[in-house]
Swiss-Prot record:
Ranges where the record places region Disordered: 1-21
The UniProt record lists the keyword Oxidoreductase: no
Lineage start: Bacteria, Pseudomonadati, Pseudomonadota, Betaproteobacteria, Burkholderiales
Stated family: Belongs to the bacterial ribosomal protein bL27 family.
Domain of life: Bacteria
Pfam families in alphabetical order: Ribosomal_L27 (PF01016)
One cellular component term from this protein's GO annotations in UniProt: cytosolic large ribosomal subunit
Record's protein name: Large ribosomal subunit protein bL27
InterPro entries: Ribosomal_bL27, Ribosomal_bL27_CS
GO biological processes: translation
GO molecular function, one term: structural constituent of ribosome
PANTHER family registered for this protein in UniProt: LARGE RIBOSOMAL SUBUNIT PROTEIN BL27M, RIBOSOMAL PROTEIN L27
Amino acid sequence: MAHKKAGGSSRNGRDSESKRLGVKVYGGQAINAGGIIVRQRGTRMHAGENVGMGKDHTLFALVDGHVKFATKGADKKHTVIVVPAAA
């Protein structure tokens, strides 16, 4: 016969791995074509000029230049723009 009671299992002890979302390159900073500007879930920020959007809503630069953040339209959507570097 056992002399110890069976130990109960804890219902805690699990957590999901962080997804490292957010702004990766800030306003005024230089970026190369293909560089990631924002990692996001859904379109919290929208792609403006010279910015592409991946299937997971990641915003990335289409040209070399500097990043600029703006609010556009009557509903003040947050938009990310890349101002091309002078050639």
